[in-house]
Amino acid sequence: MSDLKCAQTLVLAAERDFELVQLMLEHNGGADEVFGFHVQQAVEKLLKAWLAIRGESYPLTHDLEQLFEVLAQGGVELGAFRSLSDYTPFAVVHRYEALGPQEPPMDRAQAASRTASLLARVKEFLAIPDRS
């Protein structure tokens, strides 16, 4: 599969996860663990798509910080997107274990907003012929 086709496939998959994030936000429903899992999945797929667009291989990992680091090493300015790495535990730990009572409340609106911004940014790259 070409890098561009791979990126398009990953973005479509990320959009499916993000659709659930939006529905859960709109209806204030579902467990935080499920919400966080779909944020993590959307972000992971978007970061891998971004790397594919750049023609770079990406590690097979759920670790968002590792994916952000690969982009940063390539000179990509990540700004506030990098805070989304906080959702890594939702792919591996909180997918099976509930959040503890000591966990701070999740800011779903902020997570959804940052994920939406990341989605828009990656989709922009797919529409631009020069993907440098």
Question: Where do the protein language model's features map onto the residues?
Answer:
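Terminal alpha-helical segments
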Residues: M1-S132
